[in-house]
Amino acid sequence: MKKNFRVKREKDFKAIFKEGTSFANRKFVVYQLENQKNHFRVGLSVSKKLGNAVTRNQIKRRIRHIIQNAKGSLVEDVDFVVIARKGVETLGYAEMEKNLLHVLKLSKIYREGNGSEKETKVD
């Protein structure tokens, strides 16, 4: 994911937390705030309580990959921060994807069928 799709500055994180709305499930919390750009931006937060640096970086890579795959179905004019909760470090990729997309659907950031997802025909 390119750097212009990321929330990096502390003031941006603080604004999203202070002025934005939050949605959560057991594994993730998502804060969102509308922006004036023509693309979404995402910030990631993984606590040191979830494991060592290797584990935390693996979680962040997986979250980035899930968001990259869902990019075409994400609302464009929003900044959001994904916070990983305790227990996410034990999830496999498929379960993590299911949980993250669930909370993104709750927040109306993710809309199914909007993007470049390929449909497979079953005969």
From Swiss-Prot:
Per UniProt, the keywords (alphabetical) are: Endonuclease, Hydrolase, Nuclease, RNA-binding, tRNA processing
Query: Which InterPro entries does its entry note?
Result: Ribosomal_Su5_D2-typ_SF, Ribsml_uS5_D2-typ_fold_subgr, RNase_P, RNase_P_CS
Q: How does it assemble?
A: Consists of a catalytic RNA component (M1 or rnpB) and a protein subunit.
Gene Ontology biological process: tRNA 3'-end processing; tRNA 5'-leader removal
Q: What does this protein do?
A: RNaseP catalyzes the removal of the 5'-leader sequence from pre-tRNA to produce the mature 5'-terminus. It can also cleave other RNA substrates such as 4.5S RNA. The protein component plays an auxiliary but essential role in vivo by binding to the 5'-leader sequence and broadening the substrate specificity of the ribozyme.
EC number, as in UniProt: 3.1.26.5
Q: Name one GO cellular component term.
A: ribonuclease P complex
The record's family statement is: Belongs to the RnpA family.
Q: Which organism is it from?
A: Streptococcus pneumoniae (strain ATCC BAA-255 / R6)
Entries under HAMAP family matching the protein: RNase_P
Transmembrane regions = none
In its UniProt entry, what is this protein called? Ribonuclease P protein component
Organismal lineage: Bacteria, Bacillati, Bacillota, Bacilli, Lactobacillales
Q: What superkingdom does the record give?
A: Bacteria
Q: Which GO terms describe its molecular function?
A: 3'-tRNA processing endoribonuclease activity; ribonuclease P activity; tRNA binding
EC primary class: hydrolase
Known catalysed reaction(s)? Endonucleolytic cleavage of RNA, removing 5'-extranucleotides from tRNA precursor
Record gene name: rnpA
